[in-house]
Amino acid sequence: MSRRNRAPKRDILPDPKYKSQVVAKFVNHIMLSGKKSIAEKIVYGAFDKIKAKDASANEVEVFEKALESVSPMVEVKSRRVGGATYQVPVEVRPERRQTLGMRWIIDAARKRKENTMGDRLAAEILEAVEGRGAAVKKREDTHKMAEANKAFAHFRW
């Protein structure tokens, strides 16, 4: 284990278009190999497609609603007791909830069949809002796993 202090959390500057830290963090998650301008084009393009589908909706609010419907409340962590390894259900911290939600939306979007990443992302976000899609299924599977291992909750540390 490291003897150094934990690195301090860095503040994320809000993104230039929507002035939202959540969107800025999402852009950073989309980004590959430091290509932020491309990541911004993808995210903003997806948001434009969401806006085109429903003109009355605010795209950032739609995204935050999707993120909320995908973010897990509980997850399982492996805990070794004696010779056995148990899957112990633990509550997810708010920051990790957000990060996992973003990661799952992106992973699900990358596996979709649409032509561009912007199309895939928009479709996945819209499905997440409706409670469908691969990212929502991932959350349900995680919750089922935690529910199935509820008996080991007393191994929490």
From Swiss-Prot:
PROSITE patterns: RIBOSOMAL_S7. The keyword rRNA-binding applies. InterPro entries: Ribosomal_uS7 (IPR000235), Ribosomal_uS7_bac/org-type (IPR005717), Ribosomal_uS7_CS (IPR020606), Ribosomal_uS7_dom (IPR023798), Ribosomal_uS7_dom_sf (IPR036823). Disulfide bonds: none annotated. It comes from the Bacteria. One of its GO terms (cellular component) is small ribosomal subunit. Pfam families: Ribosomal_S7. GO terms for biological process: translation. One of its GO terms (molecular function) is tRNA binding. The keyword Repressor does not apply. Keywords: Ribonucleoprotein, Ribosomal protein, RNA-binding, rRNA-binding, tRNA-binding. One of the primary rRNA binding proteins, it binds directly to 16S rRNA where it nucleates assembly of the head domain of the 30S subunit. Is located at the subunit interface close to the decoding center, probably blocks exit of the E-site tRNA. Part of the 30S ribosomal subunit. Contacts proteins S9 and S11. Belongs to the universal ribosomal protein uS7 family. This is Small ribosomal subunit protein uS7. It comes from Francisella tularensis subsp. holarctica (strain OSU18). The lineage of its organism: Bacteria, Pseudomonadati, Pseudomonadota, Gammaproteobacteria, Thiotrichales.
